[in-house]
């Protein structure tokens, strides 16, 4: 059975989710809601400065998109309750506006006829968060869920492997994170985050992130053991997690590498990757794994204190896992 999906919000993640869905036979995008008009929507789908041209045909007819010959309903509703998802048979909504991240607000999609909702960002209430490679097995039929953040999707699978094999006493995470749409091209007002208002292309900007603490929500055994921060850097895409942990069980760096490699080739294949190549950030543009362990970049001070490095395409990897979560909750 094909899962029919509606996308609310056609920004970076909305568009990359759409692109990724074109490569799957189990998911069909049937509707998009955004305040953009259809012609501009088609243009932004066709051309992408980071990921290149859309691989397929995109046309506009009678105010709707025709992609690879299939009609996709286009609406421009501010209130999700008015979206009439049932008219196009939507099973799951990908909530990608960043605006409806509580059960109460996301539930408007259910009111409008959708069966389930996946938030493409960390929830702002107790809506459960699910990360592939960490806690998909804990899904218990909830109709509204969150796919957490791109950084949590990188950190959680790695942290799980390390904790399951060696035990984590405590840890600090830094993500060196590519620029995102909320940042400014030149210095501008940002009342809640003064540093965040500085020019994105000119600065390395320290920032807060809830990604490490969120790992404690998807992996309760790590609750209170991890926290972290971010540096926003002047690159358009691909980020990297630096996880420094104290281990319960002593392990050489070679043993850690072996454990991660085994997981990447086994139960976490497609989520966790492993490389011993001399890679840099652009090598991961378009990477669908949400966490690729860089064996050469990590270091150990001793057998109980290590720094581990893992790469992620914060757009492509995350968007593919949004689709995996949609498929998982539709079983």
From Swiss-Prot:
Entry keyword set: Acetylation, Cytoplasm, Glycolysis, NAD, Nucleotide-binding, Oxidoreductase
GO process annotations (BP): glucose metabolic process; glycolytic process
MF-aspect GO terms: glyceraldehyde-3-phosphate dehydrogenase (NAD+) (phosphorylating) activity; identical protein binding; NAD binding; NADP binding
UniProt KW Nucleotide-binding keyword: yes
Residues given in the record as D-glyceraldehyde 3-phosphate binding sites: 149-151, 180, 209-210, 232
Gene3D superfamilies documented for this protein: Dihydrodipicolinate Reductase, domain 2 (3.30.360.10), NAD(P)-binding Rossmann-like Domain (3.40.50.720)
Consequence recorded when altering residue 267 to A: In strain: E2666-74
Residues that bind NAD(+): 12-13, 34, 78, 120, 314
UniProt catalytic activity: D-glyceraldehyde 3-phosphate + phosphate + NAD(+) = (2R)-3-phospho-glyceroyl phosphate + NADH + H(+)
Family: Belongs to the glyceraldehyde-3-phosphate dehydrogenase family.
Database matches in NCBIfam families: GAPDH-I, PRK15425.1
Name of this chain's protein: Glyceraldehyde-3-phosphate dehydrogenase A
Species whose genome carries this gene: Escherichia coli (strain K12)
């Amino acid at each position: 059975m094909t899962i029919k999906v509606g996308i609310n919000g056609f920004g970076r993640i909305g568009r990359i989710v759409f692109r990724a869905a074109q490569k799957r036979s189990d998911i069909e995008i049937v509707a998009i809601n955004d305040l953009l008009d259809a012609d501009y929507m088609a243009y932004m789908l066709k051309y992408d400065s980071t990921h290149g041209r859309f691989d397929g045909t995109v046309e506009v007819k009678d105010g709707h998109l025709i992609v690879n010959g299939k009609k996709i309903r286009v609406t421009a509703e501010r209130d999700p309750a008015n979206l009439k998802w049932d008219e196009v048979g939507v099973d799951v909504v990908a909530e990608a506006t960043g605006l409806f991240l509580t059960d109460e607000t996301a539930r408007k999609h259910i009111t409008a006829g959708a069966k389930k909702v996946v938030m493409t960002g960390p929830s702002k209430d107790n809506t459960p968060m699910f990360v592939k490679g960490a806690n998909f097995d804990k899904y218990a039929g909830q109709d509204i869920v969150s796919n957490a953040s791109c950084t949590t999707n990188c950190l959680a699978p790695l942290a799980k492997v390390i904790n399951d094999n060696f035990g984590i006493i405590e840890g600090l995470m830094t993500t060196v994170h590519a620029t995102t749409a909320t940042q400014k091209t030149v210095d501008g007002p940002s009342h809640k985050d003064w540093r965040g208002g500085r020019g994105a292309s000119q600065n390395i900007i320290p920032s807060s992130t809830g990604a490490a603490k969120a790992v404690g929500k998807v992996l309760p055994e790590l609750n209170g053991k991890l926290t972290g921060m971010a540096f926003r850097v002047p690159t358009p895409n691909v980020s990297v997690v630096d996880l420094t942990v104290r281990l319960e069980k002593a392990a050489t760096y070679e043993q850690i590498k072996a454990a991660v490699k085994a997981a990447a080739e086994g139960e976490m294949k497609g989520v966790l990757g492993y490389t011993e190549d001399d890679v840099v950030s652009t090598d991961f543009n378009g990477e669908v794994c949400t966490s690729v362990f860089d064996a050469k970049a990590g270091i150990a001070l001793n057998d109980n204190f290590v720094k581990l490095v893992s790469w992620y395409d914060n757009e492509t990897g995350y968007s593919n896992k949004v689709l995996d979560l949609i498929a998982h909750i539709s079983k």
